[in-house]
């Protein structure tokens, strides 16, 4: 039997089957079924190129490479751009993904390695130019993994589909534990179907083994996509793992029954990640095969930056007038006494603490926003929720590099930064009281500079490279002395991607304005927010010292041009007799000339708009952000009221 439909991919891994490799991607269908995609035919590979600059007269001997036990095939060469100029690049196929690091190590020193540290599952998204939302068609097969549908497909059976709000199933839980003995006293879980909005509530007490068995059975029976709770990364997941391991000792069946939360077969053995049991390693977030662990504490911390990060504080911050959405009055520091005196109240308290994380996640729109970021960055949900910013940027940049014959260097291969990059310009604040202050902001300051000055790893002019601009090509020279190719000679990957993201955001903003349906408006809002997040992440990643497509001159040049722009405008305003009372990185605070004016409010607004328009340039567009009738500061930077 065949099945086709749209799915949202949550997470993935690979499995070795004989001599071949199968990708396993877990997803939730638009029609609500849980789906496992088993993708066949994708071969693991990396690329090599000779060390140093390329000279046509050089001989290349591939015997060392082809003689390696792990190597199955070599393709090429294809001429690709590298930081040392255009060079021949060979694609080396190996038997299994886990063989790539060993083969890289054996070739290190003799060859320059490219595309050698890209997780194998990412190849589904990169090679197919796919995102988390895809349309698939394949043969339905039986599977030991606990899913509604298992499909056997190839890359040709998957194609892009427009993003849609996936009907995820969410499992939110909480534990109450003994302070004296570390044992689990009770547990609670709330399961939500985001397709229907329905919730079911469950509580557990009794002996510890029974609690863990029933909680695990609830997970496996309800097949959630996302596991959440408050501070589960630092407490609840670890406590389940510790207690289940202590109880089960070497009894595998008991271990499965008490902590087998993964969306994988209970007969599976030998994996260290993406497995049946919760694992963590050195990462912040926990890892489960087929599910995304998404801590509400971490999401609230990122979204709200609250003064305190406790569940009580965050709940009160978000729901100050709703008594049903506050923590109950139970003293967690005396949990043993509370449990002995009023167990029913503690169970109710536990259930409340299991449900509040769901309410918080919806209030801060964490589920839909992470889904939107995944859709824009073209990664699985789990990468959006728990991955790094560089992983999101990698997804966009690497696929463009692959399609434009640009070699992909290894992470950490860039020159190390010798010191911190000088940041944005901060104009000393003038102490005192100032009336009618117009605030001007640079629109997307760093992205605009990167576009306007064509700043990219691929456009930086390096004397050590064989790839140099033509004699008549104009160059962009930054205040630091670094030089970049003109777009007439080479358009950078980063400016191209940023322009594309800006265009996407304009489309979604227009969609928000034109939407007559609240759900459509919400969709466009989430998407434009996700695009904004990604655009603003580019500078931080490319100015870092660890990213693969970077050089210290990139970040230095961006901030230098930004400082030059803002200082130039401040000087011109001063020459005109205007009074700048403060500026900080991408904002300028200008006092409006209102002497003898009847309506200073209207004058300030008109002054703000006209000043922004006068000083806007292609790579430095100013906007009138707002105005202050009164601005006061005691003279300290970043400290003012208005």
What is each model feature region?
Residues 1-69, 144-228, 247:
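Conserved RNase H-like, two-metal-ion catalytic cores of nucleic-acid enzymes
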Residues 3, 18-20, 132, 333-453, ...:
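Common nucleic-acid-contacting/processivity interface regions adjacent to the catalytic cores
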Residues 72, 83-165:
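N-terminal accessory regions of nucleic-acid-interacting proteins
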Residues 116, 123-136, 283, 296, ...:
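Catalytic nucleotidyl-transfer cores of nucleotide-processing enzymes
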Residues 157-166, 220, 422-436, 571-573:
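A short acidic-Thr-Gly-centered motif at the start of a beta-strand
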Residues 199-203, 223, 227, 237, ...:
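Active-site-proximal helix-loop-helix substrate-binding element of RNase H-like nuclease domains
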Residues 323, 565-585:
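Active-site palm subdomain of RNA-directed nucleic acid polymerases
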Residues 591-642:
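C-terminal polymerase-core module
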């Amino acid at each position: 039997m065949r099945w086709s439909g749209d799915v949202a991919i949550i997470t993935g891994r690979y499995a070795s089957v004989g001599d071949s490799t199968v990708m396993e991607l877990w997803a939730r269908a638009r029609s609500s079924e849980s789906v496992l995609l088993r993708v066949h035919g994708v071969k693991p590979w990396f690329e090599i190129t000779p060390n140093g600059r390329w000279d046509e007269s050089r001989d290349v001997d591939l015997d060392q490479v082809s003689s390696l036990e792990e190597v199955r095939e070599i393709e090429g060469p294809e001429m690709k751009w590298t930081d040392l100029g255009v060079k021949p690049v060979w694609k080396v196929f190996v038997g299994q993904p886990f063989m790539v690091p060993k083969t890289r190590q054996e070739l290190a020193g003799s060859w320059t390695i490219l595309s050698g540290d890209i997780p194998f599952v990412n190849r589904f998204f990169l090679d197919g130019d796919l995102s988390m939302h895809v349309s698939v068609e394949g043969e339905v097969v039986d599977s030991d993994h606990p899913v509604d549908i298992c499909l056997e497909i190839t890359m040709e059976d998957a194609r892009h589909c427009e993003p849609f709000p996936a009907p995820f199933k969410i499992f939110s839980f909480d534990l109450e534990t003994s302070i004296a003995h570390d044992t689990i006293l009770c547990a609670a879980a709330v399961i939500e179907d985001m397709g229907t909005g329905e919730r079911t509530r469950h509580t557990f007490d009794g002996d510890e083994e029974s609690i863990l068995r029933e909680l695990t059975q609830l997970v496996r029976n309800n097949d959630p996509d996302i596991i959440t709770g408050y501070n589960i990364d630092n407490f609840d997941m670890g406590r389940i793992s510790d207690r289940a391991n202590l109880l089960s000792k070497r009894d595998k069946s008991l271990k499965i029954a008490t902590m087998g939360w993964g969306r994988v077969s209970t007969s599976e053995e030998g994996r260290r990640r993406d497995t049946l049991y919760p694992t963590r390693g050195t990462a912040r977030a926990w890892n489960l095969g087929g599910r995304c662990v998404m801590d509400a504490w971490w999401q609230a911390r990122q979204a709200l930056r609250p003064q305190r990060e406790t569940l009580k504080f965050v709940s009160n911050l978000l729901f100050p007038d709703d008594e049903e959405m506050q923590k109950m009055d139970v003293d967690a520091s005396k949990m043993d006494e509370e449990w002995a005196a009023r167990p029913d109240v503690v169970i109710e308290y536990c259930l409340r603490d299991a449900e509040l994380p769901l309410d918080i996640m919806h209030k801060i729109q964490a589920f839909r926003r992470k889904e939107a970021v995944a859709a824009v960055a073209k990664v699985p949900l789990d990468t959006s929720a728990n991955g790094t910013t560089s992983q999101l940027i990698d997804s966009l940049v690497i696929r463009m590099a692959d399609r434009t014959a640009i070699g992909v260097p290894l992470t950490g291969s860039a020159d190390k930064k010798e010191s911190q990059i000088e940041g944005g310009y901060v104009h000393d604040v003038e102490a005192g009281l100032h009336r009618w202050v117009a605030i001007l902001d640079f629109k997307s300051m760093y992205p605009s500079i990167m576009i306007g000055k064509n700043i990219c790893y691929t456009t930086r002019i390096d004397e050590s490279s064989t790839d140099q601009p033509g004699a008549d090509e104009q160059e962009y020279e930054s205040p630091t002395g670094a030089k970049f190719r003109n777009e007439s000679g080479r358009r950078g990957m980063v400016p191209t991607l940023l322009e594309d993201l800006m265009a996407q955001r304009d489309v979604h903003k227009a969609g928000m304005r034109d939407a007559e349906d609240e759900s459509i408006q919400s969709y466009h809002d989430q998407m434009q927010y996700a695009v904004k997040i990604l655009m603003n992440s580019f500078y931080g990643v490319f100015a870092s010292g660890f990213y693969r497509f970077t050089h210290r001159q990139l970040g230095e040049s961006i901030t230098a041009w930004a400082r030059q722009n803002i200082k130039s405008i401040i000087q011109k305003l001063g020459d005109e007799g205007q009074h700048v009372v403060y500026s900080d990185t991408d904002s300028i605070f200008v006092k409006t000339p209102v002497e003898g004016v009847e309506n200073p409010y209207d004058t300030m607004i008109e002054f703000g708009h006209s000043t922004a328009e006068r000083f806007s340039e292609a790579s430095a567009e100013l906007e009138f952000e707002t105005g202050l009738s009164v601005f006061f500061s005691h003279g300290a930077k970043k400290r003012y009221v208005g």
